[in-house]
From Swiss-Prot:
GTP binds at residues 14-19, 132-135. GO terms for biological process: positive regulation of translation. The keyword Protein biosynthesis applies. The keyword Chloroplast does not apply. It catalyses: GTP + H2O = GDP + phosphate + H(+). This is Elongation factor 4. It is found in: Cell inner membrane. It comes from Blochmanniella floridana. Gene3D superfamilies: 3.30.70.240, Elongation factor 4, C-terminal domain, Elongation Factor G (Translational Gtpase), domain 3, P-loop containing nucleotide triphosphate hydrolases, Translation factors. It comes from the Bacteria. Residues 2-185 form the tr-type G domain. The lineage of its organism: Bacteria, Pseudomonadati, Pseudomonadota, Gammaproteobacteria, Enterobacterales. One of its GO terms (cellular component) is plasma membrane. The gene is lepA. Required for accurate and efficient protein synthesis under certain stress conditions. May act as a fidelity factor of the translation reaction, by catalyzing a one-codon backward translocation of tRNAs on improperly translocated ribosomes. Back-translocation proceeds from a post-translocation (POST) complex to a pre-translocation (PRE) complex, thus giving elongation factor G a second chance to translocate the tRNAs correctly. Binds to ribosomes in a GTP-dependent manner.
């Protein structure tokens, strides 16, 4: 065990984590030159297209130290950098004794850099700072080193200068990992304790779990059980990633590897992420600390746009939730959209990734309702009800107050963009908490309603700061607020899929946007279509799509005018009858257009 090192690479998005992983793999001979490509550990096509890491990936490398010529087993976990996937970082660090914090020498310290450093410190990990991209013409080593000293508090003499692209300084990082990162603390002779870090579904093998063996040894063919659920499994296969999936006969204490296991109850497909596995014979007395259960920030209804059955859709979501434990879902029914699921996400990017994965991996096209947040509702008997759906809010009677989620937002930006960012925060009903100048950067903290930052806040922040401002946020508390539910009525019929919860200040503006969108999308009928946005019984916005009208008098070329009047009168009676029995059918294309955030 003294020759094993477990570590993660953490950083803000696009600071070079995956490129550094590539260099480690190349130097340690994990792949030959013919097999090497950029972003080796980003196995999803979606990750390569977007240029970001979405899922944490593990690789076991053998490195021969320059100092003592000894071979070391390095278990590396590459992690995402986007704020929506910070839960992935937390899970990856649970299997490690240290971390390499990568900082872009041109961009400098950003919000998620600080957030990931705090996560590592909370777990009492040894952190090595690597200043990356020093080969860029825009790199400012002195400025960024000063930022690291003032914001993070690490001496600039301890910073390793490197370029993951060219390989400069990468060997120095590997040597520092061997020297600074502690040996895994465990006992090979103790009862087995293996922590499940991640799981995913394979069409041929079933559920595959990524595990870290904290104590004991796990062999192929062992009978194991979940310490949280008590479910019993048989180990079919196990091994390591090099990054190729290599089978082995056992995983020893301190190692990180993969595991294929099946239950006698075929309906049970795997133990949950964060669970502890132990042997059925000679089990461990207590489980390892579980991951903190994360609460979704953003909720939306997902409905299949095509002919996908509810069973197929539910099966796809279940398989995705194995791979992404932060995805929450429950059944939901809409009069217009049919059966679907109410899903919880960590942010809008997380929602987009799930939507794209359902489309690519399971061929399911979706209609997604307007994203919202979880509200806390206090009713007259002082009972608290949590609401993530506008329709659920409408069904509650005796409401005393509605409380919206407030998040603590930490901004990091150059000084010259401070004024415009403050204006944006004030516009979004923000309250300033602190303002600190560090080196050439400003650390600004605001309390903001979660509902105000889930839609266009990131885009506007990046636009006004030319991409230099960064944001990291965490849930703070629920706060009483004047929230209302806007409903859409079409000829008096409620369209529940378009209901939305907003602040009363913006209700009229939001209602007008919805009504105008619907007016531009709904085709004219042979009767008037009245579109209304209402709050309770009060109409806040109204518009009419005028009827198509047939020229019933075209055959009357002369004669008595009463003939024309009679035809027009009969048409009027027919239109009135048609309006009473006629129904406006909204096709899926209308919902897809009106619920598209980019439209």
């Amino acid at each position: 065990m003294k020759y094993i090192r477990n570590f993660s690479i953490i950083a803000h998005v696009n600071h070079g984590k995956s490129t550094l992983s590539d260099r480690f793999i190349q130097i340690c001979g994990g792949l030959c030159d013919r097999e090497m490509m950029s972003q080796v550990l980003d196995s999803m096509e979606l990750e390569r297209e977007r240029g970001i890491t979405i899922k944490s990936q593990s690789v076991t490398l053998n490195y021969r130290s320059r100092s003592n010529e000894q071979f070391y087993q390095l278990n590396l976990i590459d992690t995402p950098g986007h704020v929506d996937f910070s839960y992935e970082v937390s899970r990856a660090l649970a299997a490690c004794e240290g971390a390499v914090l990568v900082v872009d020498a041109a961009q400098g310290i950003e919000a998620q850099t600080v957030a990931n450093y705090r996560i590592a410190m909370e777990r009492d990990l040894k952190v090595i700072i690597a200043l990356n991209k020093i080969d860029l013409l825009t790199a400012d080593i002195n400025r960024v080193s000063k930022e690291i000293e003032e914001i993070i508090g690490i001496n600039s003499n301890d910073i390793i200068l490197c370029s993951a692209k060219t390989g400069l300084g990468v060997l120095d990082i590997l040597e520092r990992i061997i020297i600074d990162i502690p040996v895994p603390q465990g006992n090979c002779d103790a009862p087995l304790q293996a922590l499940i870090i991640d799981s995913w579904f394979n069409n041929y093998l079933g559920v595959i779990s990524l595990i870290c063996v904290k104590n004991g040894i796990l062999h192929k063919g062992d009978t194991i059980q979940s310490m949280n659920t008590g479910q019993i499994y048989i180990v079919n296969q196990l091994g390591i990633f090099t990054p190729k999936q290599v089978q082995r006969m056992s995983l020893n204490c301190g190692e990180v590897g993969w595991l294929v296991y099946t239950s006698k109850n075929h309906r049970v497909m795997g133990a949950p992420v964060g669970d502890t596995l132990t042997l059925l014979i000679n089990p461990a007395q207590k489980s390892l600390p579980n991951f903190k259960k994360i609460q979704p920030y953003v909720y939306a209804g997902l409905f299949p746009a095509g002919s996908t059955s509810q069973k197929v859709f539910a099966d796809a979501l279940y398989k995705l939730s194995l791979n992404d434990s932060s995805l929450h879902y429950e059944s939901e029914y809409s009069e217009y959209l049919g059966l679907g699921f109410r899903c919880g996400f960590l942010g809008l990017l997380h929602m987009e990734i799930i939507q794209e994965r359902l489309k690519r991996e399971y061929a399911i096209d979706l209609i997604i309702t307007t994203p919202g947040v979880m509200y806390e509702v206090l009713v007259v008997d002082d009972q608290i009800i949590y609401v993530d759906n506008p329709l659920k809010l409408l069904s509650i009677t005796g409401i005393k107050e509605i409380r919206e989620p407030i998040v603590l937002c930490n901004f990091l930006m150059p000084k010259k963009y401070l004024g415009e960012i403050i204006v944006l925060c004030v516009e979004k009903r923000g309250v300033q908490v602190s303002l600190v100048y560090k080196a050439d950067q400003v650390m600004l903290t605001y309390e903001l309603p979660m509902s105000e930052i889930i839609l266009d806040f990131f885009d506007r922040m990046k636009s006004i700061s030319n991409g230099y401002a960064s944001l990291e946020y965490t849930f703070n508390r629920f706060q009483a607020s004047d929230m209302v539910c806007i409903e859409i009525l079409i000829n008096g019929q409620r369209v529940n899929a378009l209901a939305v919860i907003v602040h009363r200040i913006t209700a009229e503006f939001q209602g007008r946007i919805l009504v105008n969108k619907l007016k531009s999308l709904i085709l004219r009928q042979q009767f008037d279509i009245v579109i209304q946005a209402v709050i309770g019984k009060r109409v806040i916005c109204r518009d009419v799509i005028k009827q198509l009208r047939k020229n019933v008098t075209h055959k009357c070329y002369g004669g008595d005018v009463t003939r024309k009047k009679k035809l027009l009168h009969n048409q009027k009676i027919g239109k009135k009858r048609m309006k009473q029995v006629g129904k406006v059918n909204l096709p899926n294309s209308v919902f897809m257009s009106i619920l598209n955030r980019d439209s």
